[in-house]
Amino acid sequence: MEAEGSSAPARAGSGEGSDSAGGATLKAPKHLWRHEQHHQYPLRQPQFRLLHPHHHLPPPPPPSPQPQPQCPLQPPPPPPLPPPPPPPGAARGRYASSGATGRVRHRGYSDTERYLYCRAMDRTSYAVETGHRPGLKKSRMSWPSSFQGLRRFDVDNGTSAGRSPLDPMTSPGSGLILQANFVHSQRRESFLYRSDSDYDLSPKSMSRNSSIASDIHGDDLIVTPFAQVLASLRTVRNNFAALTNLQDRAPSKRSPMCNQPSINKATITEEAYQKLASETLEELDWCLDQLETLQTRHSVSEMASNKFKRMLNRELTHLSEMSRSGNQVSEFISNTFLDKQHEVEIPSPTQKEKEKKKRPMSQISGVKKLMHSSSLTNSSIPRFGVKTEQEDVLAKELEDVNKWGLHVFRIAELSGNRPLTVIMHTIFQERDLLKTFKIPVDTLITYLMTLEDHYHADVAYHNNIHAADVVQSTHVLLSTPALEAVFTDLEILAAIFASAIHDVDHPGVSNQFLINTNSELALMYNDSSVLENHHLAVGFKLLQEENCDIFQNLTKKQRQSLRKMVIDIVLATDMSKHMNLLADLKTMVETKKVTSSGVLLLDNYSDRIQVLQNMVHCADLSNPTKPLQLYRQWTDRIMEEFFRQGDRERERGMEISPMCDKHNASVEKSQVGFIDYIVHPLWETWADLVHPDAQDILDTLEDNREWYQSTIPQSPSPAPDDPEEGRQGQTEKFQFELTLEEDGESDTEKDSGSQVEEDTSCSDSKTLCTQDSESTEIPLDEQVEEEAVGEEEESQPEACVIDDRSPDT
């Protein structure tokens, strides 16, 4: 950690008031703050500094020497720098909007924090030196540069009665200690850290007091409104204590945590006193303004969700004005990830479809009758669950099952296209889940093979290989050092099982396509997360097949808890819920950062499931974070799936969904936009949660973005020759409104001045233009309609999907 503090003096000339060893001066004018915001992708340069909490006041005399603690939390303070004279207008104003970003600086650490830190360091040292991982048979070295040899993560393993509502008797650690983010190299920040104001490249105003709101997170910027309110209120409290000479009273949990001499009115000038009082009042007024906008029926995280959507709309509007391809990428991202309400004209069904839709909906479509159990016995089960002539080569590949970037396509080749069965079986063995939950190995293999058979081999992206990739990615994320011993075995089982079933029976089209075509599934699930609901129904229904109930030995309470968790996790893979999910996680992380403890307790179901939901969501959106060779293969597959949907839409006379028209789609630009506006903000937030364990993942993500950026053609793509095919590109540029309605319908955003119909299907589903799209697209109707258009195949049941047809038998 010494290296992290060495860069503290580097900010002397950054335009911000420099800090002395004992105090701080007023900040420079707003136009000098975070000058790097003028770059399209600002560079984040957090610093480790110690500031006096009452930074408006002159620094106190240096304290008497204190004995060094056995396990210090911070490096020695940097040498004092002469503060520059405050320029005119340097007085800081309160937040002008909820888009203001607050800077949180170090103040010191309490005895409790030092104890927790030292305790965690002891456990971390043991884990690093021995490779020990509770619940895992092998040492996990999945984080080579972020984990090995470093002692910078911390998980408190103290007991907490009833901490997990799912399994209070076996719930492990009591929380996750959020670490300060010291970036080893300059990295781009996501658009979330830009100004939340139109045509203003620098933050409107950083709360003058938010910079002292946290003891642990030195220069971390806070961008979620609720966390900013908390930071400001903590500053108001500290200033009030200074103004009223109340800081000598018994300290509370909200008191400044560093030992500082008492400050009373006599120690400062009357001018400084009045200035501090005025700024405190302004800060309090800003907090009141923010709280007055809250609505009782909405959560505080919706403040962040509305803000992020407003900022994304502004970014997409700018992108759409640059070129036709930029307009298409903007429309795709908006339709897919902003959960818009679509007004569409539903086409009339064909006669054949009418006949099929007369059948009852009492059965779950897509479930096939398969017999895998008859040939399986405990003595005949192969080493990896499937028979293969290349078992030794497969074993070599599976040695990387605990590492980020497993070559899942190679696993599929070596296993006879059974990657899901092989990887799930290996992970269950690694984590000893078979023994923990008394799962018969033949039952596990039977279920896995049955589940894998219900993924469609003719779907380019949403198939069994994608499911295996998400399972393995979730497995690695669960093993991240920061989350060690945080989740129970039942929660781990739920996350892995949810990853395995999250796209089962996916037909290769989006949710919106199913809605637009008036599919049976859309009717059954009321147009709400159509595919995600179907994936859950099929995944649980298959447990009822012969010798497939892998949860047969769980208690009733365990089964109920697991089912609830799996449902919550899979429904969260609906890409239209992305911004809400991101806002919830970022609000939770930043709220804990600005509190005195900085500890994320995860002591209730809501917080714990939120982390698991985001974990699987990250795994589902992990393609751009994998090695470029794998990422490019996934990109080719998702684009092939998109183009197939576009061809079906063209045949039906429907408007072609964004990024689904093979004649004018910009693949490279779509990947860059997808990373900038969706993947990077998500992984950036996850990296904050588990810092520093995901730094290598962010590095790979940035490298991949730069590669795709370098491949974008310099000249604009020519207009298509066929006016029929190019009609979508000839429409007006897609525009996005810059403000959201305050009536609570935060997810509903109307397009201003644009004729673009958002009914296009490619959007609302998990169709990530670049990488793994999520379980949002299921083209039931499409396949049905395709059948009607094709030759007479009524006698052939399609194992393919959930359609209005009867299940295969």
From Swiss-Prot:
Known EC number: 3.1.4.53
Output the PTM entry.
Long isoforms that share a conserved PKA phosphorylation site in the N-terminus are activated by PKA through phosphorylation. Isoform 3 and isoform 7 are activated by phosphorylation (in vitro), but not isoform 6.
What GO terms are given for molecular function? 3',5'-cyclic-AMP phosphodiesterase activity; 3',5'-cyclic-GMP phosphodiesterase activity; 3',5'-cyclic-nucleotide phosphodiesterase activity; ATPase binding; beta-2 adrenergic receptor binding; calcium channel regulator activity; cAMP binding; enzyme binding
Q: Name one GO cellular component term.
A: nuclear membrane
Q: Where is this cross-link: Glycyl lysine isopeptide (Lys-Gly) (interchain with G-Cter in SUMO)?
A: K387
Which residues fall in a compositionally biased region of kind Low complexity? 90-102
The record lists Mn(2+) as bound by D503
Organism domain of life:
Eukaryota
Report residues binding Mg(2+).
D503
**Which UniProt keywords are present, listed alphabetically?**
cAMP, Cell membrane, Cytoplasm, Cytoskeleton, Disease variant, Hydrolase, Isopeptide bond, Manganese, Membrane, Metal-binding, Phosphoprotein, Ubl conjugation, Zinc
- Location (main, coarse): membrane
Q: Where is this region: Disordered?
A: 1-107, 343-364, 710-729, 739-809
Q: Which residues form the PDEase domain?
A: 386-715
Reaction catalysed by this enzyme = 3',5'-cyclic AMP + H2O = AMP + H(+)
Which SUPFAM superfamilies is this protein grouped with? Answer: HD-domain/PDEase-like
Stretches of Acidic residues bias are at: 779-796
Q: Where is the composition biased (Polar residues)?
A: 762-773
User: Magnesium as a keyword?
Assistant: no
Q: In this chain, where does the modification Phosphoserine occur?
A: S142, S299, S301, S348, S375
The tissues in which it is expressed are:
Expressed in colonic epithelial cells (at protein level). Widespread; most abundant in skeletal muscle.
Cofactor list: Zn(2+); Mg(2+); Mn(2+)
Instruction: Tell me the protein family, please.
Output: Belongs to the cyclic nucleotide phosphodiesterase family. PDE4 subfamily.
What the protein does?
Hydrolyzes the second messenger cAMP, which is a key regulator of many important physiological processes.
| Summary of subunit composition and partner proteins | Homodimer for the long isoforms. Isoforms with truncated N-termini are monomeric. Isoform 3 is part of a ternary complex containing PRKAR2A, PRKAR2B and AKAP9. Interacts with PDE4DIP. Identified in a complex composed of RYR1, PDE4D, PKA, FKBP1A and protein phosphatase 1 (PP1). Isoform 5, isoform N3 and isoform 12 bind RACK1 via their unique N-terminus. Binds ARRB2. Interacts (via N-terminal region) with SHANK2 (via proline-rich region); the interaction is increased in a PKA-dependent manner.
| Protein name, UniProt field | 3',5'-cyclic-AMP phosphodiesterase 4D
Q: Native species of this protein? A: Homo sapiens (Human)
Q: What is the lineage of its organism?
A: Eukaryota, Metazoa, Chordata, Craniata, Vertebrata
Question: Gene for this protein?
Answer: PDE4D
